[in-house]
Amino acid sequence: MHRVMLNSKHRYSIALCVVLIYISALVSLIIQPFAMSELNPSYIDFAKQLPVADFGPTAPIVVSPGECFTGTLTGDYEIKYIYLWTIKGEELKLLNYSLKFEKISGSTLRICVPEEVDNGVYDLELVADNAQYSVPRSVWIIKQLDNKLRVVVMSDLHFGAGPVNVTTGDINRYSAAVLATSLNPTLILWAGDIADTASESETRLAQTYRYMMLYSYPVLGVPGNHDHLGENYRKYLGPTRWARVISNKTLVIGIYTTPYFIENNVITWDEIVFLEEALRNYSYVPYKIIVTHYPMFYYQGELITRYDDESLQPYTQGSSTPVSSYWSGNMTAFRYVLKLIEDYNVTAVISGHIHVDQYVKYTSTRTNTTTYFITVTTAAHGSSTYQGITVFDLDLNTGELMFPVKPPGFIGFNNSTSRSASNSVPVSIVESKVIRAPLFYKLSVYNRASWYTVNASTIMVLPWSTSLEKIQIRQGSVNNNAELIISKHDVIGDRLFVNILMNIPPKTSAEVSVSGIDDTSPPRIELTGKKYSPPVPVLNKTLTLYFKVTDDAWGLDYSNYVFRYNGTSIKVEYSPQTIMTDLNEMYLTITLTVKGVNKTLTILEIYVEDNYGHSILRKYGIIFYPAGVTPVEDPVFEVIETTSPITITSPPITMVTNTTTTGTTTYSTYTSTSTTQTQSTPTAITTSLTKPTTQTYTTSPTPTMTITTSEQPASTSETKITTSTQLAIQQPTYTIVLTGIVVVTVVIVVIALYIALRKKTS
């Protein structure tokens, strides 16, 4: 038996290895709890640039099992293998297929799908040596199709804007998605103006929204004038023109009719050439649909005419022509495209842009063909009528066009002197919101209609980073007969898949939330470091106060705020207003003006709730002084009263918490018919906010004084109040700091051991 003798160099090398292993284990133990609670990806970060040029989330390739298609790469990628994957059905079944491919030119690939692939919309994954590139919701596999094609049309989504502010636009967009899924479409069409300013952030939000809210449905869309130049549109949504054949029965063509900077021309001849070639190449397909942003007609009702009829004159102010002003600048292009529509017996032309409904039944006296021109109102932006989406069924045996849901006021293709109609289903009937904080989401749906029931099973996909075992689900119904239930959920990569069952009868509402952390504390309200300006509140001049409202867990409830000044409620304007961000931190900028001549004490009350139901009220005394007076007290101070509890009565809820047993997920469930929670806080808080007539406040060193509220206004004091709000997102600084400390410690230890080793071996 041999004894191995180690010299000092070997001993120090072994010691160094042991120390490094120990440090690695320690780092792993420290980091793991924090890694499991990393913040979810933001909506903008969730969206990725497309690696291909000829298909994408709003222009998926349509193929049958065993067929091949081509794709043009946008970069110099050395692709090693390609696969498709999707999540399907109420059981969230994962489908995954490897694809054969070959390079047929410098950047063009020929990709073939296997015979055994199932129906559905898929993500295409391109894998290189050191990277993976995703084309989300970009391949639509059709084995067989029903004899009815149900189409939902959404136009003018205007991400980044809304009819009043961005928040109202966000609510309309979420409502449109929930309404669309409840209609169970075969296909969804987007008719342009997806972004509001064509910015990268707006277009990335659109990609995330398309993935998150409309996951199971194919979406075919075109850009509009607000997506001008289309560069960001191409980067994140797909090509600006395309032709897709659906099951050899329906041809859908998308063209870009809104290039800016082309004088008196709504369409380029390149687009017309593309349209004509597509119609000619697929002339054998029985039914044809064209999607374009600008409508060819500005009219409501029936037209019996032909492309070269002299009655089709360009629009001029005061004229009665049915030709839209947008195409009137180039009547040659208008007549040429209309002739193509007649020659190839186009079934329908879908448009948007004008933010109202206009339906035209066009019958050609030359070809004896009928084409339906359907122009739809905006889904989310301002409108002279309302926001809505359109749904129609196309019978693939007869070509008949039918409307399965007709809202009150529906007139179809009947003539109307108002040149508009109310044919779309209003998105406001299903008011829906998705609220998120860094580790929290809540979907709420309120069915305002008396004539429509929301009934659907749909998959939502949430950007996610927490493990499956930490997920908590809370689902509740404001009305006992309304259901909004997460029946199944699973985490795959950086996304949480949830199957949601919706059954919400008229005039009922429900909500469901999912979180990765507990919420055990109420929000916090504080003056920021800036506090207020000027440093002395002066009568008859503007005072601006800066507040920060924070909730670290489930975030702030944007529907439950109360702001009162001198006992009178204040309607607060938020800027910017959006709910497509983390709502865990908010900055308030409140501007106040008090008119008068004498030193005046006023009271500002701020009440907020979080998404769990915790609430907090803060009262601030604000003293206004005559000009030139130097105060001896703090002019802005918190009013401290006797501690009292908050009482919150919650609607019936069902809590679902996950526990893991031998690799399988089990559920522990409890149900309460009424929940009351009590919290103690260091300040007096009452959720009733009952307005008193007279209040007396004593502070030190402020002398006792009496203020009179707006019910008994002082003769020398008149209050004018304006407010604004700014949002901010909390950063995960705890993880950054901890990681920095650990890294620095490791570096120092390694350097010290290296120096010691050098000394021993020298």
Indicate residue ranges for each PLM-predicted region.
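Long, low-complexity serine/threonine/glycine- and acidic-rich segments characteristic of extracellular
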Residues: F101, G106-V113, A482, V491-G493, ...
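Proline-centered linker/hinge motifs at extracellular inter-domain junctions
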Residues: P51, I411-F413, T520-L527, P535
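Extended active-site neighborhood of metal-dependent phosphoesterases/phosphodiesterases
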Residues: V127-S138, E202-Y287, T316-S319, Y336-E342, ...
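N-terminal active-site segment of His-dependent metallophosphoesterases
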Residues: L50, A59, G75, E115-S201
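Binuclear metal-dependent phosphoesterase catalytic core
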Residues: V356-V461
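His/acidic metal-ligating clusters that form di-metal
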Residues: A180-L187, E263-S364
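Secretory targeting signatures
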Residues: M1-S37, T642-T643, T649-S650, T654-S762
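Beta-strand-enriched, solvent-exposed domains that form extended recognition/catalytic surfaces
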Residues: I31-L145, N423-R524, K541-V549, A553, ...
